[in-house]
Regions:
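Active-site-proximal cap/loop segments of hydrolase catalytic domains
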Residues: 1-168
Length: 168
């Protein structure tokens, strides 16, 4: 959603981002789930796994090439020269903030370790600094999904209220 905020050319009247990624480089270093940033961002098609992985002889630290850790090539890292990773980080939504002008509601769980709440707070702060009408809704006791019944009701109420405010 944050990428669309900077590229949509007035296609949308409003945006709602739930647990969105604002700064891809920051996200890479703060998520508790490294599979997605490593393999989705350029690592999967280039993954080289040391045959010792999973054995008592498995490597435990970085190899001499500087891009392998524990026998798995880190193709999706911000410091990777992998073309897919380079393009991915060049298109990080935080680099498009100067194009933001469409109202944005940011929703995030305060205990989300997959996409840390900092991503939502940073996007909200960027929208505020750009003068974009924006709202921040954080559920301090929820994680990546808003599952508690009362919180889910509030999530839906605020979601539709935001759309009603900007899309009529």
């Amino acid at each position: 959603v944050y990428y669309l905020c900077g590229t949509h050319e007035d296609t949308f009247d409003a945006f709602i981002a739930h647990a969105g990624i604002f700064n891809e480089e920051h996200m890479y270093m703060t998520t508790e789930e490294m599979w997605f940033p490593n393999f989705d961002n350029g690592g999967l098609h280039e993954t080289v796994i040391d045959p010792r992985v999973g054995t008592k002889d498995a490597p435990v630290g970085p190899a001499g090439d500087g891009v392998t850790f524990g026998g798995i090539k880190q193709g999706g890292s911000p410091w990777s020269n992998d073309p897919k990773a380079v393009r991915h980080y060049e298109l990080s939504p935080h680099k498009l903030v100067t194009n933001w002008h469409t109202p944005l509601m940011v929703i995030h769980g305060g205990m989300d370790y997959r996409v840390p709440v900092d991503e939502g707070m940073a996007a909200y702060n960027a929208a505020q600094m750009m003068g974009v009408p924006s709202r921040l809704l954080i559920f301090p006791d929820e994680n990546h999904w808003i599952l508690k019944p009362q919180n889910a009701l509030l999530w839906h109420r605020e979601y539709f209220k935001w759309l009603d405010s900007w899309c009529k």
